[in-house]
């Protein structure tokens, strides 16, 4: 059975398809086979696993599509890789009737979407996310872009895909650390929107991590539905879509400081959400019991709860001042005020912010 979620964005609407072996479906496979101007963008690792090893299920569809592979990893999410893709497209005489297909995780999706948004002033693209993180978050909503040496995702655009195709069979090829990275974003959705979902996760996260089909499909669908509800009302992040950035200001600081790719994005988000939770506690919003519940859910599943030991609180502040949510040099952060509810705050006193980072690093109240 294939679940379908419609994303209603007027002229930019599309469907998200979720299931197992979804490319066996004639309608879905025809989307990729009927157009001769499809180009699939992937990375070297996926090329080796699926395209060159002739994986029977995926290969029968994907081997019929022209593809181009780039280097794998967050450290390759840059303008150099963008230029390589564009050169490939121009050398092969592709025009504005091109359809790009992103086959990979968040990095491939972000780069492919960005290329689609700028190549000949915009072409269509589709998302086939292959990681848990990209299936529950990164492939949906039209955020595209690349990193700059001074900050993560500083060069980008909003460019909606024409469709998102989520097949859980891809997840069986992932190492546990990649699955855990996706778990962090799943927990984020529960903290931001839904306390009942948070309680469900406390009881079912290990089933999701072990790719048990019923719980996994429920979880992916739930996250997609929550994100779709937000982006339908705030596509360009001028309102409540900013809530999806819970923990990300701290997380992007960690990723920039340590060097892109050294910390998995989900691991950095885990720490970032905990730092945001300490900040909320010290601002007298979040109860201590809920702070500990948040720390526990990340810790129990095996995600990090403290940042890099070499990174000082002032290092976070310096990098966070380049965050996209900064307005008039005023840092704005999303914090949980309770499990299932968040708010955007500004004019944060530096000493409270520094103490919140220190408290996280010291595992304060948590043993």
From Swiss-Prot:
Pfam families: DHQ_synthase, DHQS_C. It catalyses: 7-phospho-2-dehydro-3-deoxy-D-arabino-heptonate = 3-dehydroquinate + phosphate. It is found in: Cytoplasm. Binds 1 divalent metal cation per subunit. Can use either Co(2+) or Zn(2+). Its EC number is 4.2.3.4. GO terms for biological process: amino acid biosynthetic process; aromatic amino acid family biosynthetic process; chorismate biosynthetic process. Keywords: Amino-acid biosynthesis, Aromatic amino acid biosynthesis, Cobalt, Cytoplasm, Lyase, Metal-binding, NAD, Nucleotide-binding, Zinc. PANTHER family: 3-DEHYDROQUINATE SYNTHASE, 3-DEHYDROQUINATE SYNTHASE, CHLOROPLASTIC. Catalyzes the conversion of 3-deoxy-D-arabino-heptulosonate 7-phosphate (DAHP) to dehydroquinate (DHQ). This is 3-dehydroquinate synthase. It comes from Buchnera aphidicola subsp. Cinara cedri (strain Cc).
């Amino acid at each position: 059975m294939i679940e379908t979620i419609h994303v209603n964005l007027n002229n930019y609407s599309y469907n998200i398809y979720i299931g197992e072996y979804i490319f066996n479906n004639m309608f879905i496979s025809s989307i990729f086979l009927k157009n001769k101007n499809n180009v699939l963008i992937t990375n070297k690792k996926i090329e080796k696993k699926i395209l060159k090893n002739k994986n029977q299920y995926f290969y029968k569809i994907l081997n019929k599509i022209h593809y181009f592979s780039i280097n794998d990893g967050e450290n390759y999410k840059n303008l150099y890789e963008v230029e390589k893709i564009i050169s490939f497209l121009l050398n092969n005489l592709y025009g504005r009737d091109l359809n790009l297909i992103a086959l990979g995780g968040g990095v491939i999706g972000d780069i492919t979407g960005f290329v689609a948004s700028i190549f000949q002033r915009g072409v269509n693209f589709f998302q086939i996310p292959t990681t848990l993180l990209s299936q529950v978050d990164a492939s949906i909503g039209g955020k595209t872009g690349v990193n700059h040496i001074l900050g993560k995702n500083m060069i980008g655009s909003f460019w909606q895909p024409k469709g998102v195709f989520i097949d859980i069979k891809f997840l069986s090829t992932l190492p546990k650390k990649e699955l855990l990275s996706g778990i962090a974003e799943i927990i984020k959705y529960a903290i931001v929107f839904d306390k009942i979902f948070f309680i469900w996760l406390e009881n079912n996260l290990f089933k999701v991590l072990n790719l048990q089909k019923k719980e996994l499909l429920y979880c992916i669908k739930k996250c997609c539905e929550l994100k779709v509800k937000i982006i339908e009302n705030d596509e360009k992040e001028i309102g409540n879509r900013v809530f999806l950035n819970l923990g990300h200001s701290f997380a992007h600081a960690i990723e920039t400081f340590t060097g892109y790719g050294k910390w998995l994005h989900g691991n950095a988000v885990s720490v970032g959400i905990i730092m945001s939770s300490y900040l909320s506690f010290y601002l007298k919003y979040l109860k201590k019991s809920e702070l500990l519940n948040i720390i526990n859910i990340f810790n129990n599943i095996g995600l990090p709860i403290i940042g890099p030991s070499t990174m000082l609180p002032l290092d976070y502040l310096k990098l966070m001042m380049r965050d996209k949510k900064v307005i008039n040099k005023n840092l704005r952060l999303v914090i949980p005020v309770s499990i299932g509810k968040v708010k955007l705050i500004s004019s944060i006193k530096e000493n409270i912010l520094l103490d919140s980072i220190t408290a996280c690093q010291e595992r304060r109240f948590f043993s």
